[in-house]
Amino acid sequence: AVTKADVEQYDLANGKTVYDANCASCHAAGIMGAPKTGTARKWNSRLPQGLATMIEKSVAGYEGEYRGSKTFMPAKGGNPDLTDKQVGDAVAYMVNEVL
């Protein structure tokens, strides 16, 4: 499971900036199965895999199924200019919103 100590290793202020510019378009509304930011029940099934795995999937991209619906996240949220650190900060920011 993910703890506050896990997310506090990341730059959460930078994560919010990256989120606002790149991630909110899907995660604010829950588009394509994206877990809605700030909605704990949408994140609870993902948290047990750990923050590092969640970041890896966000960097590499992810295709799967959630409650019978297909989900898809392009690598780095579709912005190849983002660094792995920026993606990590953004994921940590989103997770922090539900801890």
From Swiss-Prot:
UniProt-listed InterPro entries: Cyt_c-like_dom, Cyt_c-like_dom_sf, Cyt_CIE
The protein, known as: Cytochrome c-555
Organism: Prosthecochloris aestuarii
Residues the entry annotates as binding heme c: 23, 26-27, 73
Reported modifications of this chain: Binds 1 heme c group covalently per subunit.
GO molecular function, one term: heme binding
Gene Ontology BP terms: photosynthesis
UniProt keyword annotations, A-Z: Electron transport, Heme, Iron, Metal-binding, Photosynthesis, Transport
Taxonomic superkingdom: Bacteria
